[in-house]
Amino acid sequence: MSDFSPIAGRAPRLAVLIDADNVTARNASAILDEIASFGEPSVRRVYGDWSSSALTQWKEQARDLGLVMHQQSANTKGKNASDIGLVIDAMDILHAGKVDGFVLVSSDSDFTRLASRIREDGLQVIGIGEAKTPESLRKVCNRFVLIENIVSGSDTPTQPKSGRTSDVQAVKEPPLKAIPFILDAMKKIDPDQDDYSLGHLGQAITQLHPDFDPRTYGSSRLSDLLRKIERFEVFTQGSSVKVRDKA
């Protein structure tokens, strides 16, 4: 699942910056497990006003998961203080040059410019947030992962439980809805090509649609999703896995 390649025989070092005001504490462990698939979270910080009773659960999770809590008092009018503190720290980390990429955990569009600025320096940005996250933040990241996909698994399509609005709950889409994204990627690679490398196809999909995730369609992997769609054929050619559009 990782979009990062090993660097000098080691896993990429990631700066994980969490906006506690916009992420539910109960999902913290699952989110960190997801992040581990991309690299080593060498910087692990969570931002919020820790004097607020609303972040009690986050305090417990931070201690259990080894997250460094950064205090941001809510004394800034017109702008969330946690946002400002996170952005300042992110720029300090960026200029220090000790990490290979960033993971921004928030559903707040205010971090769109930060993600863009980090990418301008050649580092990759992974965004993690809820389905309510605006397109502006999703699209500026190299990869954007929905918390609903992280915590719900990839089983059969589900509907959100009534009366549980505080819990993120994935609504799985039918596999056929993934077809336009797959065809976009094939066109990007070569519209006249007969067969496509599964790996290259996955990379092209992510480049065009950073928030694409097979789990949205009830599959844990792209190959599993493709096999559910009759239009596509997945086959092995030598040591490579290939995909063909039969239409």
Tell where the protein language model's regions lie, with residue ranges.
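Intrinsically disordered, low-complexity glycine/proline-rich and charged
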Residues: 116-156, 232-242
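Domain-level signal for Mg2+-assisted phosphodiester chemistry and nucleotide/NA-binding surfaces
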Residues: 1-95, 124
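A residue-level signal for conserved active-site and pocket-lining positions in enzyme catalytic cores
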Residues: 19, 46, 90, 104, ...
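Acidic beta-strand-to-loop metal/phosphate-binding motif
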Residues: 47, 100-107, 114, 118, ...
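Conserved acidic residues
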Residues: 14, 100, 142
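N-terminal regulatory modules in eukaryotic regulatory proteins
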Residues: 131, 157-247
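Helical mechanochemical/support elements of P-loop NTPase systems and associated helical scaffolds
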Residues: 16, 24-27, 31, 54-58, ...
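Short, ordered loop/turn segments at secondary-structure junctions
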Residues: 20, 74-75, 107, 130-131, ...
